[in-house]
Amino acid sequence: MNIFADFTARVTKAVEALDLKDKDGISPDLSRIAVEPPRDASHGDLATNAAMVLAKPTGQNPRALAEKLALALRDDKDVAAAEVAGPGFVNLRLKDGFWQAHLSALLGDGRNYGRSTVGAGRKTNVEYVSANPTGPMHVGHCRGAVVGDALANLMAFAGYDVTKEYVINDAGGQIDVLGRSVILRYREALGDEIGEIPPGLYPGDYLVPLGQALAKEFGHGLLQMPEDEALAIVKDRAIDAMMAMIRDDLALLNVHHDVFFSERTLHADNARKIRSAINDLTLKGHIYKGKLPPPKGEKPDDWEDREQTLFRSTAVGDDMDRALVKSDGSFTYFAADVAYLKDKVDRGFVDLIYVLGADHGGYVKRLEALARAIAGDEVKLTVLLCNLVKLYRDGEPIRMSKRSGDFVTLREVVEEVGRDAIRFMMLYRKSDAPLDFDFAKVTEQSKDNPVFYVQYASARCHSVFRQASEQLGEANFDRKSLAAAAASLTDEGEIGLIRKLAEYPRLIESAALALEPHRLAFYLYDLASSFHGHWNRGTDNPDLRFVKVNDRQLTHARLGLVQAVSDVLTSGLTLIGAAAPTEMR
């Protein structure tokens, strides 16, 4: 029920009836015709650029062509007025009957209103969070978690076949550091005096319970094993414990992944998957033996002037070629990236979305180049970067540092301000823009707190129905009866609310296609503002109140409008991952 797509089709049909031709007598390309909300609502309900984009190829004056198109569109049964504006835009004003019928249809769809097929079932992998399994989630992980999860929800609602994925980085050097940190806590649990945690190890107290559990299970047994054997056991236990903690932390934020992919599986069986992926690129001519030029500026300690196995990534859009094998014969981190991306392609995904922190900006070109080399045009890879979140309390900055053990955990933030405030506010800026998060402001009960303002609109919708039940003596209100009464809505404020609701399906499609879930948060705030504004009009003018005891038909019509607002607020908040409350507590 995307009215903008509907009217784009109607405008296109009207243009086709004009039988326009270019200088060669060929019909022009009509794919650039668009119908959108006008920038100024006073200009009408819809605006089309058709005359503007077709004037040049058909050799016509855009305004004269717009006049012809406007004349044709006035014959549409739902168009009350079609007027030419500016250099050649056509503004349409629709009849009240169209909006009333749209409200009735919306009530029929309920919370499925806005669900789309624009994704056409494309198999999509959204990878997000993927924090190292070395400790609890901290607030720095919140933004990527929310952006990735909300985007996946949005795309699924728009018709994509979405898998939410978390890659467990359980094969790197940080896992050795974790294992040694846990062994220290294990020794402490056995009674050893460990003193200060040595530099380079994880000092957080969150490892103490794990050390105690190992002491209870093994006694002194781990100390009596060969070091490598003991470390392997401890690392396995530590990864399991950290991932259980991470899953629990994410659940507090209402984040749940479909797949947890272990990086270790890429290195299993003599790194079979990595070797296979490199062999595949070799057969395609993307691998060669050569030397990398020295990096600009001061050379890093691990740089070597030697012949290496290299991925020719500059041929597919990267800034430099990438090494795949270290001097000791082991594979580089990038080699694991090669195998992991190929694994996703082998699983049938055609849209690969990586949600990463802004500090991973250097990964964008190499991942894009890798996708081109592995799958050509068959796969679309997009990296979304999430900028930093700065924490404040009453305007004063809060500092955090994971390695020092002194950091603000995700759990602490959820317990203080609630899941909904975090989920909504992490989307209230575009993901690549910096975000200030003030604990005091996100718990304010005011219009300046977007999540409160939107949830308050949801609660108000439900309060209207409670009031109507009391005053009319009706326990339940059937959607069909509410929809049937929609023709009674003629007030401009009521029609304006329906217009705002009608933007939702277009918003869903455009936000999903652009991979911008923040648009949903902005829209919900605008819808809540429109609803609160109409509520306030009823406060000043009793004739505009939702419940009119002496006019049951009009009351049912207005209740239908309130139900529609509630449906869209609930739908949008659900996609964001926040609750749509029935009352504020």
Curated annotation (Swiss-Prot):
Q: Which GO terms describe its cellular component?
A: cytoplasm
User: Entry's PROSITE patterns?
Assistant: AA_TRNA_LIGASE_I
Where found, per UniProt? Cytoplasm
Name the family the entry cites.
Belongs to the class-I aminoacyl-tRNA synthetase family.
Question: Subunit info?
Answer: Monomer.
> What are the cysteine partners in each disulfide bond?
none
Q: Which GO terms describe its molecular function?
A: arginine-tRNA ligase activity; ATP binding
> Among its keywords, does the record have Lipid metabolism?
no
Q: What is this protein called?
A: Arginine--tRNA ligase
For this protein, the Enzyme Commission number is 6.1.1.19
Upper classification of the source organism reads: Bacteria, Pseudomonadati, Pseudomonadota, Alphaproteobacteria, Hyphomicrobiales
Question: Which reactions appear under catalytic activity for this entry?
Answer: tRNA(Arg) + L-arginine + ATP = L-arginyl-tRNA(Arg) + AMP + diphosphate
Q: Name one GO biological process term.
A: arginyl-tRNA aminoacylation
Top-level taxon of origin: Bacteria
Q: Which species? A: Mesorhizobium japonicum (strain LMG 29417 / CECT 9101 / MAFF 303099)
Query: Which major enzyme category is it?
Result: ligase
